[in-house]
Amino acid sequence: MRLFKQLERWKIRRQINQSIIDVIFRLRDRLAHYWQADVNTPQVDFMLLHIACSLGRIERGGCVSSLYSEMLEEMQSAVIFPQVLAIHQDLLKLMPFSIPEAEQTYFLANIHSLVLEQKQLKPLK
């Protein structure tokens, strides 16, 4: 499994720790079992690796700059954005600590790509 191997490499380099790996696999399970995502795709691996990097960075006191506002506005105006936001808010509940808004913009971008790629995701009610 590509995802697990990369997470283990980052753990050895002390970029992340075991608690972050545990969170990533909880997120993966939530995507698979609740949102009905196919979690065996490069897109999901990319998203989860990005989240792992972000959590490690936050634990070390760092934070990225926000996604370009034009890109964020384009995502927010998309017809799929309510579903993107619902998934985002659901996954945030599984995070071990507060995620800065700037980091969240990239989470939204990754989830946006996921929703575009996977039409079988659980629909909003």
Swiss-Prot record:
Query: Which cysteines in this chain are paired by disulphide bridges?
Result: none
Please give the organism.
Haemophilus influenzae (strain ATCC 51907 / DSM 11121 / KW20 / Rd)
User: Under which name does UniProt file this protein?
Assistant: Uncharacterized protein HI_0487
| Lineage summary | Bacteria, Pseudomonadati, Pseudomonadota, Gammaproteobacteria, Pasteurellales
One GO term under biological process is: regulation of DNA-templated transcription
Residue spans making up a coiled coil are none
Ranges for domain PRD come to 15-121
